[in-house]
Regions:
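A short loop-to-beta-strand scaffold at the N-terminal edge of the catalytic core in hydrolase folds
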Residues: 89-94
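Auxiliary Fe-S-binding modules of radical SAM enzymes
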Residues: 1-88, 242-250, 256-342
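Short linear Ser/Thr-Pro motifs
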Residues: 72, 106-107, 120, 190, ...
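Canonical Radical SAM [4Fe-4S] cluster-binding loop centered on the CxxxCxxC motif
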Residues: 96-133
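Phospho-regulated, low-complexity intrinsically disordered regions of nuclear gene-regulatory
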Residues: 84, 95-96
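Conserved AdoMet/S-adenosylmethionine-binding subsite of the radical SAM
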Residues: 142-151, 156-321
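Conserved alpha-helical substructure of the radical SAM core
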Residues: 121-151
């Protein structure tokens, strides 16, 4: 069975090439070709024909195809639906900011977490993405859009920490000086709160930004919209976050979806401020995107402003997320589901 060569690190490639009797620099040449987005060994013209044929007999190169592409008329945001090698689909979104271009990528096909307000979880988890499939979303978004990618957010379909090992390998690949060379400080990873994996991530001491999907400061309301809270309640999660902050020195961003009558009361704002005190935390307030199946609605502008004011009066930095691409199915998972239902 052929192996996925793009999921291999440079060191692994060098070992594989040594086993073939090839010098290490050949492995580096191939690594560079792969991270430029080539889709076949035949284009690697600085390799001998014999070596190219040998590699083709041992390995395959992942390369997603564009199943659908949407460009926002409002702000130029580009949303991709990628068709993978096995026919499954995932989404990526390219967003343009004054400080550079950011790609939001998926970590899984579907999602096992069951958050009530998120379209990605409808239908559950299909499978986890390979490191190469994570990398391809960055690489091919850049190649197709013509926009140099400077920042990555793992906030698309799936729970990144549920795919821990493959995500860690992807980070190593995309951070490689011989590859795309995107710095860890330019990468954000979002989790709904897998405490054991947050603890594991803290041990790695990576300089990325950890974003925690909190969405409520109390167990009663959080458990209703996020089943993960029944496994790891709010206080258990926040204890892990404090430990992460202490070990890494990296400020955590807390994602907080504003849901009418569920997460937007003044009392919840006060409780949230109390629980986040002393963490150097930042709260990223997010107006709820419409997901018909959820039966939930976004908070009013007045409720959002009131909530933000209470946080800031209590010393918590809070910002309202700028909504991009609202005219091209802004909610996670919507594009994939619409495509697959056709």
């Amino acid at each position: 069975m052929k192996q996925d060569i793009k999921s291999m690190t440079l060191a692994e490639l060098q070992d594989a090439f040594a086993a073939l009797g090839e010098p290490k620099f050949r492995a580096k040449q191939v690594f560079t070709w792969l991270h430029r987005g080539v889709v076949g060994f035949e284009v690697m013209t600085n390799l001998s024909k014999t070596l190219r044929e040998k590699l083709d007999s041992l390995y395959f190169i992942t390369a997603p195809t564009v199943a659908r592409k949407q460009i926002s008329k409002l702000d130029g945001t580009i949303k991709y639906l990628w068709k993978l090698r096995d026919g499954n689909c995932v989404e990526s979104v390219v967003m343009q900011y004054h400080h550079g271009n950011t790609v939001c990528i998926s970590s899984e096909v579907g999602c096992p977490m069951g958050c009530k307000f998120c379209a990605s979880t409808i239908g559950g988890l299909v499978r986890r993405l390979e490191p190469s499939e994570l990398l391809d979303q960055v690489l091919f978004s850049q190649l197709d859009s013509g926009l140099p990618i400077s920042n990555i957010v793992l906030m698309g379909i799936g729970e990144p920490l549920d795919n821990f090992d493959n995500v860690m390998r992807f980070l190593e690949l995309v951070n490689s000086p011989d590859g795309m060379n995107i710095g860890m400080r330019h990468i954000s990873l979002s989790t709904c709160g897998l405490v054991d994996k947050i603890e594991k991530l803290a041990e790695r001491d990576l300089q990325l930004t950890l974003s925690v999907s909190l969405h409520s400061p109390d167990d009663e309301s959080r458990s209703k919209i996020m089943p993960v809270n029944r496994r790891w309640p709010v206080d258990t999660l926040l204890a892990a976050c404090r430990d992460y902050f202490a070990k890494t020195g990296r400020r955590i961003s807390f994602e907080y979806t504003m849901i009418d009558g569920v997460s937007d009361s003044p009392e919840q704002a006060q409780l949230l401020a109390k629980k986040l005190a002393g963490m150097g935390a930042h709260v990223n307030m997010i107006p709820l995107n419409n997901v018909t199946e959820s039966g939930l609605h976004t908070s009013s502008k007045q409720a959002i402003h009131r909530f933000q004011t209470i946080l800031e009066e209590n010393g918590i930095t809070a910002t309202l997320r700028r909504t991009l691409g609202s005219d091209i199915d802004a909610s996670r998972g919507q594009l994939r589901r619409k495509y697959e239902s056709n």
